[in-house]
């Protein structure tokens, strides 16, 4: 039955893809599905994008709004303990959306009042207020970054890799619409108020549609899939990205036994005896019995502090880690299988040029970047893998951060010349650009 439902959902989107109107499939959808789970939506998109049906990622992006409208009145909710706690990621996510929607309402009121206002002094103040409110709405980018960098990697681990790809593409479209709306608003009074309203509504329509998709589809997938530990990981890593308009009023700390305590309560009791033997008490329906045995020696864990041959000298794992974390640059390593395997920890996450968090480790490098950059990522990886280039360099000036960022992507080869992966190192070279002397010892 589940397969049939997924196939029907697939057929509906294929019909829309081939030109059918939403109205023509709405009745069939309503008649077939009394309620549809977010997991089925995810499976459907995954099947469409990974089958020979001819539907591509771009096609699903085009269908995204129609898809959302079809499910607007048919998505089943999922209740999970603690999601209404002020610090739970779900509550934080919804509170941000509420604050962002309130800012949209204020902007609409400002634009309507501006249109009928004749007092030039008041108009000037309203223009300042409009830019301030647009700045508040612009914080949605932080909300999107947390979604893309913290939620999406965990979704992919559970096999839901298609929804993140589609939603990230739409997020980027919304970002573009906002930049256009902001630039037009800042151009008042040279730009007409009608142009400002038009560009703002083009953004707001898509933005409000995304809020629906987040709360009625995305969060449902997360609530059905994520464990309590997944949510805790998101809580721990969220501060690195920040929050939109409002911050959590308190930290979410779930009430539960630790998994270690639960596990130990279920395991048989072990008692140490003389001469290295162990007695184990085992419960059975008929009663308890005790066995005595000598455990095998376990292989010792890697000693992080013991010296190992390392390049032209000796280092412990701990020393190597400290050295990498003290380098004045951000380092990322992607292995030969295109898996993001490592990044160093030389600066607080919220100060990183390119933010990295533990949840991203183990992710395919193509999924670590917005869809709009996918072709560039593939070009770099292919060029370094095939040896057409040893490294790629790029740089840009970030006025907002006061940094001049230099990036290098270098191929990593072993002693036999075999490709082992790509090393990315990123540094702020602005301090070096400001050097204006030929000589300096730094000892004074």
Predicted features by range, described:
Residues 1-141, 145-392, 396, 403-405, ...:
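Small-residue-biased structural context
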